[in-house]
Amino acid sequence: MEAKKLQKFSEYSMGTYLLCPKKYRYIYIEKLFKKQKRKVNEYFIFGNIIHLTCKEFYQKRAEDRSIENLYNIFRESWKRSGIRAFFKSREEEKELGEKGLYMLSNFYNSFGQKVPYLTEHYMENIFKDYIFFGRVDRIDLSADGTLQIVDYKTNKYYDVGEDNEERARKTMQLKFYAYLLNSLKSNVTSASYYYFAEDKFDTVEFNQESANYL
């Protein structure tokens, strides 16, 4: 007897399903349309550079985790990334490069020497006939043993208010990650987007009730 193939949901495909179940069916089940690929441009590569820089920073020894070394990792990642091919002038490259250094100075001031419990952590679990999976940028461990999820954002922060449908959509990714991690016998008490440019945390407190939107 052939084993039943379980349907897989990432936070992105889950978002598609919640926004429009028909669209989800056409793309992921009937495969009538190709999944939309992200457009590769300087901003997409820039976001990857920032994420990679933060990850590599914590692979350094504690005594080497200075802001100067953080900047150096960024510059080396920039050179290797191929991002220069997307700029029309050196001035454009300089402007975005300086923005990156500013973002990383915010990051250093907010996180500094605080070593994350996990970075780029992949997780998946089975829920009845479904598999949920995702990858978290950062997980911090509190003294009481609880976990805080942090998802890095290089885009601009925008306020959508509280207790409305748009807020629920915006924070669905955080709730998805927290719900999935808690299902793996962890205790997540909060999940945050960290916006580099504004040095701002957008946080939701997590409990089982918070997962009802899923």
Q: What is each stretch, according to the model?
A:
Residues K4-K5, F33:
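An N-terminal structural lobe/cap that precedes and organizes the functional/catalytic core
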Residues K8-K23, F133-G145:
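An acidic intrinsically disordered interaction segment
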Residues F9, I45-I49, E95, K99, ...:
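Generic recognition of stable, solvent-exposed alpha-helical segments in well-folded globular domains
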Residues M14-F33, K37-A62, G97, P116, ...:
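Nuclease catalytic cores
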Residues L18-I29, I49, R65-I83, S183-F196:
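Short, compositionally biased low-complexity segments
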Residues C20, I50-H51, G100, R138, ...:
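A residue-level signal for conserved active-site and pocket-lining positions in enzyme catalytic cores
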Residues T53-E120:
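A non-catalytic, helix-rich entry segment at domain boundaries
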Residues H121-L214:
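Mg2+/Mn2+-dependent nuclease catalytic core
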